[in-house]
Amino acid sequence: MSKTNKSKSGSRSSRSRSASRSRSRSFSKSRSRSRSVSRSRKRRLSSRSRSRSYSPAHNRERNHPRVYQNRDFRGHNRGYRRPYYFRGRNRGFYPWGQYNRGGYGNYRSNWQNYRQAYSPRRGRSRSRSPKRRSPSPRSRSHSRNSDKSSSDRSRRSSSSRSSSNHSRVESSKRKSTKEKKSSSKDSRPSQAAGDNQGDEAKEQTFSGGTSQDIKGSESSKPWPDATTYGAGSASRASVSDLSPRERSPALKSPLQSVVVRRRSPRPSPVPKPSPPLSNASQMGSSMSGGAGYQSGAHQGQFDHGSGSLSPSKKSPVGKSPPATGSAYGSSQKEESAASGGAAYSKRYLEEQKTENGKDKEQKQTNADKEKLKEKGGFSDADVKMKSDPFAPKTDSEKPFRGSQSPKRYKLRDDFEKKMADFHKEELDEHDKDKSKGRKEPEFDDEPKFMSKVIAGASKNQEEEKSGKWESLHTGKEKQRKAEEMEDEPFTERSRKEERGGSKRSESGHRGFVPEKNFRVTAYKAVQEKSSSPPPRKTSESRDKLGSKGDFSSGKSSFSITREAQVNVRMDSFDEDLARPSGLLAQERKLCRDLVHSNKKEQEFRSIFQHIQSAQSQRSPSELFAQHIVTIVHHVKEHHFGSSGMTLHERFTKYLKRGNEQEAAKNKKSPEIHRRIDISPSTFRKHGLTHEELKSPREPGYKAEGKYKDDPVDLRLDIERRKKHKERDLKRGKSRESVDSRDSSHSRERSTEKTEKTHKGSKKQKKHRRARDRSRSSSSSSQSSHSYKAEEYPEEAEEREESTSGFDKSRLGTKDFVGPNERGGRARGTFQFRARGRGWGRGNYSGNNNNNSNNDFQKRSREEEWDPEYTPKSKKYYLHDDREGEGSDKWMGRGRGRGAFPRGRGRFMFRKSSTSPKWAHDKFSGEEGEIEDDESGTENREEKDSLQPSAE
């Protein structure tokens, strides 16, 4: 039903928005009301729409203290309160200027314009559903009455719009206020139309069941249809337990149930949007117990609303004057819906019977019918509803009519008469109680409905109640005793449903007297209807209530009990009915007392019983689980001795172990020195020995311990280079020995390079090494590494390079290179190589030409892990490419690269930058290659001489 309501209230919401706005404005019963609604809503919506539609928001609805009202984000640092209107960019000093001044529309730049929804200024009070709050402060401030009526109207429309429980509650509140007003208004026009119809209007407005009374007298014949339909729709809406009265308007409630929201005040703002849907949804929800109750309550509202709204649509026959028609169209609807609604009712009853088709429900339906007879005409629709969900309408209707129809009609006629008098009293008391009722608006929802219907119904019904309740009592008691055992678990659920239903119907019934009665009646009807267990509970509560009704302790009983109580209390509730709020307040108290006393009785009895039943219910699965758990614990205790170690100790042990291992690794690791001491001299000192010695040790160890520790550490690269350079040195040496590879590299770099590399590869290698070393030495003490490397033959150099020590020297010389090109490239060469590969190959040809022999030999190594040298480059692509290609690219790119080289590459930068050759080669390119080859050879020779001296 909520979906139906939502769809309906979707259409209705637009309609209701326009209707409740326009209706509030144009149609509204009281223009002040509608204007306040429309003003409050206009402000809300206009602020919303304005904020959304670029209207100047600077002073839009200053809802919040200006402290928080950052004037639409004029500038947070300027202080919210400053009259500095946010100057967006592109605007001069025009606070909310025209388009060019940046003040277009919202006068704020777009990026800040639309944060108003979130701005403290709006304080989120303008939520997507702006100020739909039931006591909307604005509406309240405008006028209390206007709040109740027009604000209720706006809220009702908003509730139609949102069709949320909250809105429904609000809508019921509005309806209750509207029903009060419209019952006063409508009952006045109705009384003008005829006292009976005025009462009908009142009762339809107030108790929807008035239409039942009206129909009892006016449409006794349609009423059976209406009762049939009412039973069907009541069963569908299961909330309209008043349905003969309430349901007569709601007979079309399938369609109208959603519409009911605007039930009394609004003739047909949302004429029955989708009867089957609303019935189906109502039926489904009523089937679902609490949901059913809620839907029933909403149907009650909607049925009234539909009765009033959709009578024009569904049953244009205007039995009741259209003025009262909003609430009284329910009579028309009853008539037309008696026939049309009977089909719905039958269909829905059959559906419900299929869904909830339980003979038990039929039994309860009979009992409920009897009880509902006693309860009042509305009760028989309620009974029908109760029985109908489970029994076909005809089945439930037949016993219903047979047992209840005469009495029901009698009750209806009496009820009409009494309701006419009662409504007159109510109108008087309504004015009296309005002050009271406003004070107690929280009780508006239920008490009014219950009081109104119950007052009349209790007058008629109390006479018959004692006997009927007793009979119902006995029948229900039997049923209940039979079902009591089953009801135990359900009673709790039913109570919950009842509570939820009562809450919903309290809120939802506000403008819905039948709902009040329904709540009392439909409470159980819905619960019975929603599930056979809830009906059991309903029967239980009705038995209890029956006894209570006999005691006329209406508080602790359903509306029947209330009606029993009505003589004592319902008269006050008649007054309360007359004045919506006071009536609602007192009646809500009564409802609370009744609901809670019933609930309490049920709860206390059924809670304890339910606890037992719950335990028994729990036993199969819960006890089994408990049993398994017990077994597990037992087995663990007896068969698996605990180590006596706590989890903390256990995990601490692991942590300690890990820490010890880490400490040992750190102690062992010379990488710490490398990490800490990155100076080339340190590398030189540690380099050959440590790196060479460590290269086997460090690779795994370092790789695991240190590399893990410092992922950016060059040690990873160094390690891999060491490993790969050692391998590569072997390969590289063979390659080194082969200048052709160097030449191939140089070919890659340049054919000139290759030629030059071949020509003076060894000499140039030495010179380049010397140069590289001298550069690196000039750049840093790494030249000593270079010198060492130079001291060694190229192969030795390559070995050194391949060795971690040489790698270190290379690191020193070509900082990035050392780490990068530990693969056994000559340091100087590798400097250039690292540069040279990227550079040497293409950019750094100069050094490559000079280095080409060394670089090529090294590059043979380089190749090996060069990207060029696929095996290594692929294998260690990350490190090798980063090292070799990365370093070379990095060097070649101008130190751009070298995540790894950077650690040592920094030195390289210094060294390489210090080395004129490096800088020159870096930019020399192929041209520079030749120059570098010549000048580089000279420089390298010089540097080689310098390096030996330095070393």
UniProtKB/Swiss-Prot annotation:
Pfam families the UniProt entry points to: THRAP3_BCLAF1
Biased composition annotated in UniProt, kind: Basic residues: 14-51, 121-143, 759-772
Comp. bias regions, Pro residues: 266-276
Gene Ontology cellular component terms for the protein in this record: exon-exon junction complex; mediator complex; nuclear speck; nucleoplasm; nucleus
UniProt modified residues of type Dimethylated arginine: R17
GO biological process: circadian rhythm; mRNA processing; mRNA stabilization; nuclear-transcribed mRNA catabolic process; positive regulation of circadian rhythm; positive regulation of mRNA splicing, via spliceosome; positive regulation of transcription by RNA polymerase II; regulation of alternative mRNA splicing, via spliceosome
Biased composition regions of type Basic and acidic residues, renumbered to the chain: 58-75, 144-155, 167-188, 347-387, 411-449, 460-483, 490-518, 537-547, 660-677, 688-758, 877-891
Cross-link (Glycyl lysine isopeptide (Lys-Gly) (interchain with G-Cter in SUMO2)): 202, 215, 221, 252, 333, 346, 353, 375, 384, 386, 393, 398, 418, 424, 448, 452, 459, 465, 468, 476, 481, 524, 548, 555, 599, 694, 702, 706, 708, 753, 756, 872, 875
Chain coiled-coil ranges: none
Protein name per Swiss-Prot or TrEMBL: Thyroid hormone receptor-associated protein 3
Record localization: Nucleus; Nucleus, Nucleoplasm; Nucleus speckle
Amino-acid positions noted as binding ATP in the UniProt annotation, renumbered to this chain: G549, D550, F551, S552, S553, G554, K555, S556
Segments of skewed composition (Acidic residues): 926-936
Induction (UniProt): Expressed in a circadian manner in the liver with a peak at approximately circadian time (CT) 8 hours (at protein level).
This protein's record includes keyword Nuclease: no
Region (Required for mRNA decay activity): 359-951
Bias (Polar residues) ranges: 204-220
Family label: Belongs to the BCLAF1/THRAP3 family.
Asymmetric dimethylarginine: residues carrying this PTM: R66, R101, R108, R841
Modified residues (Phosphoserine): 220, 233, 238, 240, 243, 248, 253, 257, 315, 320, 326, 339, 379, 403, 405, 466, 532, 557, 559, 572, 616, 619, 669, 679, 681, 695, 860, 924, 935
InterPro entries: THRAP3_BCLAF1
Source organism of this protein record: Mus musculus
Complexes and interactors: Associated with the large multiprotein complex TRAP (Mediator complex-like). Interacts with SFPQ; the interaction is dependent on SFPQ phosphorylation at 'Thr-687' and inhibits binding of SFPQ to an ESS1 exonic splicing silencer element-containing RNA. Interacts with NXF1. Component of the SNARP complex which consists at least of SNIP1, SNW1, THRAP3, BCLAF1 and PNN. Associated with spliced mRNP complexes. Interacts with HELZ2 and PPARG. Interacts with CLOCK and BMAL1. Component of a MACOM-like complex, named WTAP complex, composed of WTAP, ZC3H13, CBLL1, KIAA1429, RBM15, BCLAF1 and THRAP3.
Residues recorded with modification Phosphothreonine: T324, T394, T870
PTM sites of type N-acetylserine: S2
Top-level taxon: Eukaryota
Disordered as annotated region, ranges: 1-94, 117-558, 660-951
